[in-house]
């Protein structure tokens, strides 16, 4: 039996605005949350070196810590993207103390347009330079749920 009210509730649940994004690097998962509850979870691809905190530009690592998703870019080279405010002040101080450049331009973005793999297959591999990648279809969902200013926590 089809229940239209349940279909509408389910669809609106995945497009409602979220108040936190959590990335669990060890599980290769991005979860969107509202009021402390997971709304939806996605399999992600990350940098070629997925373990450890990003220390410097070019290290192929995805940063760890608390950041802000500070702006959206609809004309990204990887479909659409949402910018992560890396480096934060702590990251900058660490890099300065080590005499290195912290890097930047870390994003949540869509698929690699040059990949010959089907989107879900490509998500099984870490292929970014430190960004967090989802499929284009998933990026469309995230685009609707995430506003600029939403916090993101990236866990080891």
Regions found by a protein language model. Name each.
Residues 20, 41-43, 66, 105, ...:
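Well-ordered beta-strand positions in beta-sheet-rich domains
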Residues 37-49:
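Short Gly/aromatic-enriched secondary-structure transition segments
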Residues 16, 71-156:
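Exported/periplasmic cell-wall-interacting domains
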Residues 12-19, 26, 46-71, 89-94, ...:
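N-terminal post-signal-peptidase region of extra-cytosolic proteins
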Residues 1-7:
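Bacterial N-terminal signal peptides
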């Amino acid at each position: 039996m089809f229940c239209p009210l349940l279909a509408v509730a389910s669809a609106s649940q995945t497009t409602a605005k979220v108040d936190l994004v959590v990335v669990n690097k060890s599980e290769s998962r991005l979860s969107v949350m509202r009021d402390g509850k997971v709304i939806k979870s996605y399999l992600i691809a990350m940098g070629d070196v997925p373990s450890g905190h990003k220390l410097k530009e070019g290290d192929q690592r995805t940063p760890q810590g608390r950041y802000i998703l500070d702006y959206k870019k609809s004309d990204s080279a990887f479909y659409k993207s949402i910018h992560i405010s890396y480096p934060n002040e702590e990251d900058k101080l660490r890099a300065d103390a080590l005499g290195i450049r912290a890097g930047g331009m870390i994003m949540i973005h869509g698929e690699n347009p040059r990949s010959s793999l089907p989107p879900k297959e490509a998500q099984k591999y870490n292929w970014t330079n430190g960004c967090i990648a989802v499929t284009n279809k998933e990026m469309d969902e995230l685009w609707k749920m995430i506003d600029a200013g939403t916090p993101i926590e990236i866990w080891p």
